[in-house]
Amino acid sequence: MKRLNTVLKEDGVQTDLILLIRTILATSKEIAFRVSQGELAGVLGSTLNENIQGEVQKKLDVIANQLLKDILLDDNSVRTVASEEEDHAVGANPEGKFIVAFDPLDGSSNIDVNGQIGTIFTIYLARDDVPYDSDEQFNQLGANQVCAGYVLYGPSSLLVMSTGGPTRCYTLDSTHGGYLLTNNQLSVPEQSSEFAVNMANYRYWDEPTQVYFDKLLYTCKSFDKSSVRWNAAMVGDVHRILCRGGLFLYPQDNRAGNENGKIRLLYEANPLALLVENAGGKATSKGARILDIAPTNLHQRVPVVLGSIAPAEYFNSTVYNSNAKY
């Protein structure tokens, strides 16, 4: 099996980007160890604080955020850092080439029940037309990402990443401490009958979205064998879709704060959209390509539909009267 470093060099990835990726992944190994220790390491439970999203922070959320932030701020190639757990961007080296955004632990509600959780990250080239430490550094289209990936912590720790080419999967070799290539090209099947959606939110959705799920569950013969899988961790649901197909949906709803969806564009929707597209799937928001959405703020939320092409287009045609071709 090939080591990550070898694969990246064969893909023609520049040395400075390879080194930055390795920096991020060094921290992922520490997070993986702490996750595996659980209560033995005293990392379970919540703090008394809330993040900017209004969510109570888990202890492991805070630890993972601090580990990633500290190592990135100490990296001379990094100009600015953004995190789900930070109100604003944090400046690093004013001359740094890259900016990095991350969700330190996606699915943090699963921490205390030993469920699926993961770290999502994305890397862009820094902008020279705005202050180095400003939120505006991240006002870039998702299509501009030079690297996107996640580490899924579970029975084995998996890295799924793309540097613009294929979406590949690596497994952490805990014996030697390196990530080894275990799937050279993840490919999302065009058709699938599996769906990742929180059906408890049905009563909050608008009528077109409800109609879609009514058709899906009761009248559409194309999906008469459909089944729902829901991990309460986007990173876990998307990983399953990358491996065997399906559709992840988190529509907007009529609850206060969810009018524009719940998934954060910068460090959740964009990196996962890039991974899904580069695996042959589709990723849209209100019928438009996610990677073409112009961001307006650091923690902007968007409704998300991503995964297998056929059910994604069926959703868009039903709800938005659009095939969202691209």
Curated annotation (Swiss-Prot):
| Annotated EC | 3.1.3.11
Q: How does it assemble?
A: Homotetramer.
Residues that span the membrane, as ranges: none
Organism this protein belongs to: Pseudoalteromonas translucida (strain TAC 125)
Q: Name one GO molecular function term.
A: fructose 1,6-bisphosphate 1-phosphatase activity
Q: Which GO terms describe its cellular component?
A: cytosol
Q: Where does Mg(2+) 2 bind?
A: 103, 106, 268
Give the cofactor note: Binds 2 magnesium ions per subunit.
Cofactors needed by this protein, per the record, are: Mg(2+)
**Protein name per Swiss-Prot or TrEMBL:** Fructose-1,6-bisphosphatase class 1 2
Q: Which PROSITE patterns match?
A: FBPASE
One GO BP annotation of this record = fructose 1,6-bisphosphate metabolic process
Pathway given in the UniProt record: Carbohydrate biosynthesis; gluconeogenesis
Q: Where along the chain is substrate bound?
A: 106-109, 198, 262
NCBIfam families the record matches: PRK09293.1-3
For this protein's source organism, the top of the classification is: Bacteria, Pseudomonadati, Pseudomonadota, Gammaproteobacteria, Alteromonadales
Q: Which residues bind Mg(2+) 1?
A: 84, 103, 105
The reaction(s) annotated as catalysed by this protein in its Swiss-Prot or TrEMBL entry are: beta-D-fructose 1,6-bisphosphate + H2O = beta-D-fructose 6-phosphate + phosphate
| Record key words, sorted | Carbohydrate metabolism, Cytoplasm, Hydrolase, Magnesium, Metal-binding
Pfam families, per the entry: FBPase, FBPase_C
| Family statement | Belongs to the FBPase class 1 family.
Q: Tell me the InterPro entries matching this sequence.
A: FBPase_C_dom, FBPase_class-1, FBPase_N, FBPtase, Fructose_bisphosphatase_AS
Q: Cellular location of this protein?
A: Cytoplasm
Superkingdom of source? Bacteria
